[in-house]
Amino acid sequence: LEHDKNVICEKPFVQSTTQAKELKKLADEKGLIIVEAITNLYLENFKQIQKELNKIAPIHIVNLNYTQYSSRYDAFLEGKIAPVFDPKKDGGALMDLNIYNIHLVSALFGLPDQVQYYANMQKGVDTSGILHLSYPDKQASLTASKDSYVTPRSFIEGEKGSIYFDGSTGTLDNFTVEMRNEQPKRYNLNKYPHRMAAEFNTFAQMIDQHDTQKADEAFVNTLETMQILTKAKNSMI
């Protein structure tokens, strides 16, 4: 930014809400684009999930799970600390994996009233944990794990039905809508085989057209996510 370059910043955007605001302020002052690279919010499946929410509403329970046994976990147990497990570099399950869950919940439901993170700690870092978000009308449980193995499944549960999907919340390869007393319907609307294609096509268009409005809209979600992350880290148990 200081060298007048537009910036695509890998998730998590920064370490704190304060840093996020500082970078956005600098970008705005220089008339530049700054945007967070977060795959799931730009996928066609996510956009369709947004449209399907009203069908199952009112929504009371959200369970999102991103479990991925880390390829560096065995080395971590032997004392070889990679950056993704280094607390000094904001490693750990919350910042590396639960960030995807937080982005989804923030984009779908906004900021919660209460935030509490329950972490499994090893060598000073959270290798897994559950983030609980409390809303006036719903409860959300966001699980992320780098030390366990499972095929994760996530649910959004409402009075009229549910939306659920298997696998990573970062890729959203497909999802199913199941209404009460109806047959479930499975969807996959993603256009590209690579999970990053949709977001980078959006970023290219955003930068080519200097679409600051779209960048501002993306930053709203980034800032909300950083606010939740900051509270989660401060609440860590």
Identify the function of each model-found stretch:
Residues N188-N201, E217:
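Active-site loop of classical SDR/Rossmann-like NAD(P)-dependent oxidoreductases
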Residues L1-L41:
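Beta-strand-loop-alpha-helix segment that lines the small-molecule cofactor/substrate pocket
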Residues K88-M95, K185-H194:
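A short glycine-threonine-serine/GTX helix/turn-capping micro-motif
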Residues N101-T171, F200-Q209:
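Contiguous beta-strand/loop segments that form the cofactor/metal-binding neighborhood of enzyme cores
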Residues S154, L172-N181:
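Short polybasic amphipathic segments
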Residues L43-P112:
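Predominantly a Rossmann-like dinucleotide-binding segment in NAD(P)-dependent oxidoreductases
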Residues K21, T202-I237:
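C-terminal helix-rich "cap/oligomerization" subdomain common to oxidoreductases
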